[in-house]
């Protein structure tokens, strides 16, 4: 009996074990399924939120670009209307010319039609655009505000070299004095062979301080000229071409006479000096 009771108890215990384990597994599966469903719900919510944010961003971008495109189109249309208004007001461009009955070509003027929706443009903007797009020559030559070109001299040039300037910057007397002083001889002194001969004959050369500012033709000895030298205008005349050569060939009579006297006076002295040099050469180098 006890054995049978033990067997029954063990069988009952064995039969009762699967029921207990089954209840425990069911509870665990329920917890796992609940966690899985919660995770899926959170993922779905996150996906929905991201999609909504994307939609909002896309709509904002589209609206922004649409507004910018509208503003660009409106600006372009306003610019075209403004150009049409300006061309209808002032820009009358000459087109192909037609020959009239007399044979004289007559230019045809093209005037574009005035638009109905004209915009109010300030006059300075119209003038600026008109000057920018229209050629300056020969249509607007009278409207170019350029100063006149005047060639001004400083008044220091002698008469043959003055340009086409008619503006008198100084008094006539002052101008004549400037012209006379501007052609004076330089302060240095030109020395010729005749001066050396005269100085040797008269007893030595003169100090250079006594001859400073005076040219070689201004001495009073030996039939030379005295006083200041002739002015540049007197020498060259009004035409610096052939008249200068003619005056140079003719020259003042006193100057020519003085040079002739010097040449006739120097000729025998030069011949004597040459003869003495040849004699010395023959003595030093015998053949």
UniProtKB/Swiss-Prot annotation:
A motif (PPxY motif 1) lies at residues 158-161. Residues 64-287 are cytoplasmic. Its main location: membrane. InterPro entries: TMEPAI/LRAD4. GO terms for cellular component: early endosome membrane; endosome membrane; Golgi membrane; intracellular membrane-bounded organelle; membrane; plasma membrane. Residues 239-258 are annotated as: Disordered. Highest expression in prostate. Also expressed in ovary. It is a single-pass membrane protein. Keywords: Endosome, Golgi apparatus, Membrane, Repeat, Signal transduction inhibitor, Transmembrane, Transmembrane helix, Ubl conjugation pathway. GO terms for biological process: androgen receptor signaling pathway; negative regulation of SMAD protein signal transduction; negative regulation of transforming growth factor beta receptor signaling pathway. It is found in: Early endosome membrane; Golgi apparatus membrane. The PPxY motifs mediate interaction with NEDD4. The SMAD interaction motif is required for interaction with SMAD2 and SMAD3 and the negative regulation of TGF-beta signaling. Belongs to the PMEPA1 family. Functions as a negative regulator of TGF-beta signaling and thereby probably plays a role in cell proliferation, differentiation, apoptosis, motility, extracellular matrix production and immunosuppression. In the canonical TGF-beta pathway, ZFYVE9/SARA recruits the intracellular signal transducer and transcriptional modulators SMAD2 and SMAD3 to the TGF-beta receptor. Phosphorylated by the receptor, SMAD2 and SMAD3 then form a heteromeric complex with SMAD4 that translocates to the nucleus to regulate transcription. This is Protein TMEPAI.
């Amino acid at each position: 009996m006890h054995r049978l009771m033990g067997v029954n108890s063990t069988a009952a215990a064995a039969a009762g074990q699967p029921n207990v384990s089954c209840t425990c597994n069911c509870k665990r599966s329920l917890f796992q399924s609940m966690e899985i469903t919660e995770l899926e719900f959170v993922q779905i919510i996150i996906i929905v939120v991201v999609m909504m944010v994307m939609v909002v961003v896309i709509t904002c971008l589209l609206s922004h670009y649409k507004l910018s495109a509208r503003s660009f189109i409106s600006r372009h249309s306003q610019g075209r209307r403004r150009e049409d208004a300006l061309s209808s007001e002032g820009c009358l461009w000459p087109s192909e010319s037609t020959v009239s009955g007399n044979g004289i070509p007559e230019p045809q003027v093209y005037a574009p039609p005035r638009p109905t929706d004209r915009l109010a443009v300030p006059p300075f903007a119209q003038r600026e655009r008109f000057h920018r797009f229209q050629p300056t020559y020969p249509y607007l030559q009278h409207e170019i505000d350029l100063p006149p070109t005047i060639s001004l001299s400083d008044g220091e040039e002698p008469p043959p070299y003055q340009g086409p300037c008619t503006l008198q910057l100084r008094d006539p007397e002052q101008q004549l004095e400037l012209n006379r002083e501007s052609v004076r001889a330089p302060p240095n002194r030109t020395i010729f062979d005749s001066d050396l001969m005269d100085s040797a004959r008269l007893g030595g050369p003169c100090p250079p301080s006594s001859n400073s500012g005076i040219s070689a033709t201004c001495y009073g000895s030996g039939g030379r000229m005295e006083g200041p030298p002739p002015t540049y205008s007197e020498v060259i005349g009004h035409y610096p071409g052939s008249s200068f050569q003619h005056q140079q060939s003719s020259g003042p009579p006193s100057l020519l006479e003085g040079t002739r006297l010097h040449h006739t006076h120097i000729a025998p002295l030069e011949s004597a000096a040459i003869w003495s040099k040849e004699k010395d050469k023959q003595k030093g180098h015998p053949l």
